[in-house]
From Swiss-Prot:
Positions that bind substrate: R14, D15, S168, H195, Y286
Family of this protein: Belongs to the 4-hydroxy-2-oxovalerate aldolase family.
Pfam families in the record: DmpG_comm (PF07836), HMGL-like (PF00682)
Gene3D superfamilies in the cross-refs: 1.10.8.60, Aldolase class I (3.20.20.70)
Entry annotated with the keyword Lipid biosynthesis: no
CDD domains: DRE_TIM_HOA
HAMAP family (UniProt xref): HOA
List of residues binding Mn(2+): D15, H195, H197
Top-level taxon: Bacteria
Encoding gene per record: nahM
A Gene Ontology molecular function term of the record: 2-isopropylmalate synthase activity
Protein name: 4-hydroxy-2-oxovalerate aldolase
């Protein structure tokens, strides 16, 4: 495995927001950013779990307005870059400008893996604002490695400084990750990143697979705090990479203490691979489908796991929630209910 230094981007204050129902306070942000910054974490992502502009009835209301949290993070950090996530269609160029004014130095622009073309204007503005830019290809398992590489190439052409393979459903196996990193390396001139979810218990393993294949930017979250079963655990990743002789620039004891004494007390429960998360990882569908599948399953007398398996087979993506009732009805009819 290569010994090239790995840049870890910590997403506790963004993906972790999902796990605590977007209840971060300014004091939480101050304490977490200070601890991560002092430990040597180079990039800290701060925003609503669904990115800039995500606070809404649809995606969940933030306890504290995200621009206040970003401003607090930027004011607190001494060395780490403050980043924010932006999903075109949820966040707008207006929110991106506001986030820049509040102190972000990096924006991670996320699209469905097959829809990179919707990000062109956002990358354009980000470059005008002087931000480091990251392309974030979500649900990356849904395209072949070669198809994903072409979407990554689009993001690079729009101005992405890094392109991330994002395992949004936590469904990839290590070889899936390796194949996609290799495919991107063949066509890109910019570095590659990987964002894992732990729904199959493979977040650390998949992150190592990405590094083995040539990724140099890896997302992680202290205590693994994130959607579903969480993300690659920052302190564990730092320890493993240290054992392997791979430099991260992060002090292991300090990041362990940040997770133990600052992040853990904020958690409602530990991040575990429970039945719901495992179902998402196994079926490879969006976690937002789960609640709807449970409702449809109750209505039609069908196990919601069967609904999700069929949705995965049909390659349903976010925005196709209307398929859920159709699938439940079809399964019920097939069983003669």
């Amino acid at each position: 495995m290569p010994k090239q230094a790995i840049r870890i981007m910590d997403t506790t204050l963004r993906d972790g927001s999902h796990a605590i129902r977007h209840r971060f306070t300014k004091e939480n942000v101050r304490q977490i950013v200070q601890a991560l910054d002092e430990a040597g974490v180079p990039v800290i992502e701060v925003s609503h779990g669904d990115g800039l502009g995500g606070s809404s009835l649809q995606y969940g209301m933030s306890l504290v307005e995200e621009m206040e949290l970003i401003e607090e993070a930027a004011k607190t950090s001494r060395r780490a870059k403050i980043a924010a996530l932006l999903l075109p269609g949820i966040g707008t160029k207006k929110e991106l400008q506001q986030a820049k004014d509040c102190g972000i130095q990096m924006v991670r622009i996320a699209t469905q893996c097959s829809e990179a073309d919707v990000s062109e204007q956002h990358f354009g503005l980000a470059k005008e604002l002087g931000l480091e830019t990251v392309g974030f290809l979500m649900m990356a398992h849904m395209l072949s490695p070669e198809e994903l590489a072409q979407q990554a190439k689009l993001m690079e052409s729009y101005g992405a400084d890094i392109v991330y393979i994002v395992d949004s459903a936590g469904t990839m196996l290590p070889q899936d990750v390796i194949d996609r990193v290799i495919a991107l390396k063949k066509v890109l001139n910019v570095p590659i990143g990987f964002h894992a979810h732990n729904n199959l218990g493979l977040a650390i393993g998949n992150s190592l697979a990405a590094i083995q294949a040539g990724a140099t930017n890896i997302d992680a979250s202290t205590r693994g705090l994130g959607a579903g079963s969480g993300n690659t655990q920052t302190e564990v990743l730092v320890a493993v990479l240290s054992r392997m002789g791979i430099e991260t620039g992060i002090d292991l004891f300090q990041i362990m203490d940040a997770a133990e004494y600052i992040v853990d007390p904020l958690m409602d429960s530990p991040m575990i691979v429970n039945r719901d998360a495992l179902t998402i990882g196994f079926t490879g569908v969006y976690s937002t489908f789960l609640w709807h599948a449970k409702q449809a399953g109750e209505k039609f007398g069908v196990d919601p796991r069967e609904i999700l398996i069929e949705l995965g087979r049909r390659k349903a993506v976010a925005g196709q929630e209307d398929w859920i009732l159709d699938v439940a009805s079809d399964l019920s009819s097939a069983k003669g209910r």
